[in-house]
Every structure is written in structure tokens, then in C-alpha cells.
Amino acid sequence: MIEETLLEAEEKMDKAVEVAKEDFSAVRTGRANPGLFAKVMVDYYGAPTPLQQLASFAVPEARTLLITPFDRSALGDIEKALSNSEVGANPSNDGNVIRVVMPELTQERRREYVKIVRGKSEDAKISIRNIRRKAKESLDKIVKDGDAGEDEGSRAEKELDGLTKTHTENIDELLKRKEAELLEV
């Protein structure tokens, strides 16, 4: 039961790190990146549909993104969704593809994005700490119920602390890389 609890905690912590990676990739850096549009929803035939399901992406230049819809009738809907998104993109529709040129980021905007990324990083760490707390409660209950000995419980707790530390360090490393990417001019 202890191993199952630790394995479950590790899987949840891995998921928290993955979510942080996705959140970080959604913060723009001045370069074109299809991940920026991961959460853009298009009103396609009356149903909100993720942009990735409607089009393919190409990055021909550092600040240009080409979006090629699988169905050309969706061009207008995609362009409208991009214009209304929080990405700050300026789409231009040439009838076949949508070209998005990412504007240069000002230093002030870069600092705002760094704050946003730090907030997302802290959210991920809080999530990891909550996972640790719940796993520790489960471990304590297992020991209290007599399903495992005190020694096993303390060994598992140390392993849980190691997992927490490793995953928190992963978040810190992701944050450091994203900050460097954002502040690079």
C-alpha cells in the first residue's frame, strides 16, 4: 500500500510539472510558437473547437506563424478566434492560409510575462505540495491502521520528500529557462 501511495503521488507530481510546461509554452516570447495557440477555441459550426483540431501550423520565420486550416471554410472563424484571443496576435487571411506575425515585445511587456510565469510556477509548486500533503496523510493512516511499520512509514516519508524536492526543482529549472527566454532581446 505504501508503494502504491508513493507511485500515485509521483504520477500526480509528474502531471503537475507537465501542466506547468504547457502553461509556460502558452506565454509568448516574441517568437512564433504553435503552443501559444494551444488554448484558443474556434466557434466551428456552433461548437467551440480547439484550434489544433482545425489546422496545421508552420513557422517559416522566427516571428511568423502560418496556420493552414484543414477545411478552408473555417478560415474566417479561425481568424476571428485569433483576433479575440489573449495572445495579442494580428492575423492576416490570404484566402488559403492565415499568417500571424508576432510583434516585438517591449521590455515592460517582457517583465509582465515574467511575473505571469512566476505565478504559474508558484501554482505548480503549491499543487506539488498539496499532493505531498495528501500522500503523507495516506501514509500516516496506513501506519496508524497497522498495515505498515513505523520504519516503513518514515522511509516512505523520506522518499516522498525526495520526490517533492525533485519535482519542485524541475519547476524551478523550467522557470529559470522561461525567464531567460523572455528577457532575451
From Swiss-Prot:
It comes from Renibacterium salmoninarum (strain ATCC 33209 / DSM 20767 / JCM 11484 / NBRC 15589 / NCIMB 2235). The keyword Zinc does not apply. It comes from the Bacteria. It is found in: Cytoplasm. InterPro entries: Ribosome_recyc_fac, Ribosome_recyc_fac_dom, RRF_sf. Gene3D superfamilies: 3.30.1360.40, Ribosome-recycling factor (1.10.132.20). Disulfide bonds: none annotated. Its main location: cytoplasm. GO terms for biological process: translational termination. Residues 142-165 are annotated as: Disordered. Keywords: Cytoplasm, Protein biosynthesis. The keyword Iron does not apply. Coiled coil: none annotated. GO terms for molecular function: ribosomal large subunit binding. Responsible for the release of ribosomes from messenger RNA at the termination of protein biosynthesis. May increase the efficiency of translation by recycling ribosomes from one round of translation to another. The lineage of its organism: Bacteria, Bacillati, Actinomycetota, Actinomycetes, Micrococcales. GO terms for cellular component: cytoplasm. Belongs to the RRF family. This is Ribosome-recycling factor.
